[in-house]
Structures are given as structure tokens and as C-alpha cells.
């Protein structure tokens, strides 16, 4: 752990490998620490799937680490940032895999990443994969609706979108007027349309028609 915290990832990896025989007789607490460190090393090396598997194993073995939640959140951020880079470089298939992994880390909270995974899969022309993602989005009634905080700039007369904290703060100034909260449009109609289009792409016009009728 000291080597890893000092930034010596390779040193930490080598130490784990050279200590393999010691871990064969180690207690559960020590083994959990080993699993956690291995997960951190995988994350640092961008082996995201392996990192998630080890963090999951750590939690399943009742491992305790005060930084666990923050570390998993950081893992999610690392995965998403890597997927953004992949999309920018047109590595859509790789991006889709990572975004789906980000969704799996916390399906209740990270539904947006499933939506983006579906989109990346379409761009990768992996239609059967994208279809499975869109069908899952439909199944969980994902609408992607978010709240927007809007105000009109007194200087320009144009609407601007603010963060929630800016929205609350700027109300105390005279720089903006016409403060309002609005919801974005539902993404569900787009999801249904994409399901139908993919069925057409796959040559199943009957299911395409059925999807539209729903």
C-alpha cells in the first residue's frame, strides 16, 4: 500500500507477486487488503473491468475501507473519461463497453451511462448490442429528464443555463432576471424510435412496427 500511495505502481505489483506464498496462509483481513490494493492497481493501469470485479469481491467478502465509496466513484469517473476519449477518437465499440461498465457499477444511479452506451454501440454499428441496451432502457422506463436552471442575462437579453448553485447565488444579484426551472424533454420517444430503426436494420420489420405501436 505504501508503494502504491507513493506512486510506485510497478513496485506495488512486484511486491504482491513476490509475496504470493505469504498470502496463501494469510487471514481474511489481510486478503481483503490485498484484493483492494489489486483493484487500485488495475484502476491505475486502466484495467477497469478487472478493477470493478476486485472491488466487488472486496465488498462481498465484507472488506472494510473508509475510502471505498470514494474509490468506486473515482473508478466510475475514470471509466467515463476514458470512454469520452474513445468516442472522440471514434473508438465507439471500446467506449460502449466502458459506458456499460460504468452503468453496471451503480445501475440505479448511472442510468445515463446505459443510454450513452447504446448510442456508442449504434455508432460502432453493433446493432444487436445497442438494441439490448435500448430495450433495457425501455424496460426500466428511462426518460433521461433532467432539471435545467435558466435565467436571462440583463446585459445581453439572452437566456443562459446555470448550475443549481449559480441559480441560487445569482438571484441575489441584478445581473439576471426571469429565473425559472424547466425539465428537459423525455428521451423515451427517441429510444422507441431507435429500437424500431435497429429492428429494421436487422431485417425484422414486424418487430419494428410493433415497437412503434407501443
Predicted feature locations:
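Alpha-solenoid helical repeat scaffolds
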Residues: 17, 24, 53-56, 100-101, ...
Amino acid at each position: 500500500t505504501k508503494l502504491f500511495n507513493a506512486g510506485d505502481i510497478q513496485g506495488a505489483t512486484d511486491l504482491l507477486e513476490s509475496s504470493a506464498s505469504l498470502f496463501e496462509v494469510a487471514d481474511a483481513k489481510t486478503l481483503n487488503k490485498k484484493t483492494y490494493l489489486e483493484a487500485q492497481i488495475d484502476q491505475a493501469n486502466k484495467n477497469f473491468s478487472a478493477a470493478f470485479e476486485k472491488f466487488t469481491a472486496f465488498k462481498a467478502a465484507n472488506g472494510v475501507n473508509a475510502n471505498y465509496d470514494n474509490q468506486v466513484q473515482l473508478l466510475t469517473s475514470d471509466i467515463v473519461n476514458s470512454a469520452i476519449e474513445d468516442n472522440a477518437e471514434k473508438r465507439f465499440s471500446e467506449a460502449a463497453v466502458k459506458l456499460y461498465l460504468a452503468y453496471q457499477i451503480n445501475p440505479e444511479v448511472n442510468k445515463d451511462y446505459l443510454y450513452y452506451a447504446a448510442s456508442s454501440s449504434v455508432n460502432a454499428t453493433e446493432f444487436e448490442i445497442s438494441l439490448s441496451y435500448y430495450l433495457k432502457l425501455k424496460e426500466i422506463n428511462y426518460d433521461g429528464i433532467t432539471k435545467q436552471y435558466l435565467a436571462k442575462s440583463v446585459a445581453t437579453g439572452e437566456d443562459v443555463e446555470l448550475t443549481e448553485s449559480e441559480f441560487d447565488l445569482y438571484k441575489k444579484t441584478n445581473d439576471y432576471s426571469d429565473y425559472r426551472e424547466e425539465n428537459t424533454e423525455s428521451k423515451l420517444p427517441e429510444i422507441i424510435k431507435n429500437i424500431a430503426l435497429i429492428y429494421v436494420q436487422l431485417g425484422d420489420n414486424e418487430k419494428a412496427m410493433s415497437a412503434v405501436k407501443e
